[in-house]
Amino acid sequence: VKSILLFFITTALFISCNNTQQGNGTQKLGGDIKIDGSSTVYPITEAIAEEFRAVQPNVKVTVGVSGTGGGFKKFSRGETDVTNASRAIKESEAADCKANNVTFLELSVAYDGLAVVVNPQNDWTTSITVAELKKIWEPEAQGVIKKWNQIRPEWPDAEIHLFGPGVASGTFDYFTEAIVGESGKSRGDFTASEDDNVLVQGIEGDKYGLGFFGVAYFEENKDKLKLVGVDNGSGAILPTLETVRNGTYKPLARPLFIYVNGASEARPEVKEFVKFYLEVVPQLAQEVGYVPLPEEEYVRQTEKFNTFISAIPAAH
C-alpha cells in the first residue's frame, strides 16, 4: 500500500511540475503587468504584449497611453511596471523616482523619425527647411506668423492651421528641442492632442493644415496625408528606414525607450516580459513602422538588462 501511495504522490508531483511548463518549455506565469506612457512607443509595446499574451496567456498585460510625461508621473509613483518613452527621462522625473524609492532601468528599443505632414490637397509644400519650421513653431510666432505666405512669399495668402502633440508628449518635447532649440518652448495657438489619431483627422480635413508626429502614424495613414521633406541644409530628406538609421534625417530622428521599475523586475512575469521584449522588438518594431537598432545595440541592451536583474533579489 505504501509503495502504491508513494507511486501516486510521485506521479502527482511530476504532473504538477510538468503543468507549470508550456508546450515550448517556457514556464507558465501569472500576474498583471501595467504599462503606460508614450503614444509613439505604444504600437511597438502593444504588438509585443499581444505576442507575449499568446505565450503566457495567464499574464494580464495592459498598455495605456498618457504621453511620455504623464507616463513618467505614474511610473515615479510606482503605479506602473514599465513606461514607454519617446525621449530620455528628465532630471526632475528621475528625482521624483528617487524620492519615491523607485529604481529603474532605461532600455533603448528602436529609432523613430518625426514626420512633418500636410493635407494631400496642399500642392505647394513638398519640402520645408529647419529654419522655416522654427519660424512657424517658436513662441514668438504666436499671433504673428499666421499665413502660409509669411513662410515663403510664393505660398498661398491663407491661414496656416497647426496641429501637434500636447505638452505632456515626448514627441512635443523632442520636436521643440530639435527645431526651436529648447524643450517645451512653442507657440500655444495650435490644435494639440496626446492622441495622434486626432492630429491625423485634423490635418486630413483641413487643406491648410500642417502638423507633426511619429512617422509610424504617417505610415498608417499615408493615404490620407502628404509627407513633407525636411531640409537641414543638405537638401530635403524624407524619413525612411535608411535616413533615420544613418542620421541623414536630422534633426528629427530619435531613439525610443522603455523604462522598467526595479521592484517590478523582481517579479518573474515582468522579468520574462522584458526579456521577451528585447528578443522580438527588432522584428516587430519594423513591422509596425519603426526603425530597429543595429544588431550590436540590441546585444548591448540585453547585457544591460542581464546586469540589472542579476543585482535584484528574486520576488517570492
Q: Which residue ranges define each predicted feature?
A:
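Sec-dependent signal peptide recognition
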Residues: V1-F8
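Flexible loop/hinge segments at secondary-structure junctions
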Residues: C17-H316
